[in-house]
């Protein structure tokens, strides 16, 4: 199944993936995360994002058959959606955290 135009994904099957959903919110950057679930991962993600100065405005968390499907609405410290360079940083940070790096 093809990904809708305008969406960016990083990762390969079996590894953590982060999908930016452009236009999903005017108030925040929407980041969908899929990964193998493990104890403490949600806490680690929140801590990593906060450590980078990225605020989680809202999170929708789900786990199916040991796989997470978490959607984060994130903003910068100014409360605005992240600019492109910060989005790339958030994607990289989330993938590294999910992969235990």
Model-derived features: positions:
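Regulatory modules associated with amino-acid/nitrogen control
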Residues: 1-101
């Amino acid at each position: 199944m093809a990904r809708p135009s305008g969406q960016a994904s990083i990762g390969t099957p079996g590894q953590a993936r982060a999908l930016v959903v452009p236009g999903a919110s005017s108030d925040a950057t929407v980041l969908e995360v899929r990964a193998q679930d493990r104890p403490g991962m949600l806490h680690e993600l929140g801590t990593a994002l906060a450590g980078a100065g990225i605020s989680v405005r809202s999170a929708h968390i789900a786990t199916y058959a040991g796989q997470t499907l978490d959607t984060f609405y994130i903003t910068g410290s100014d409360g605005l959606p992240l600019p492109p360079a910060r989005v790339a940083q958030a994607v990289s940070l989330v993938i590294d955290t999910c992969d235990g790096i």
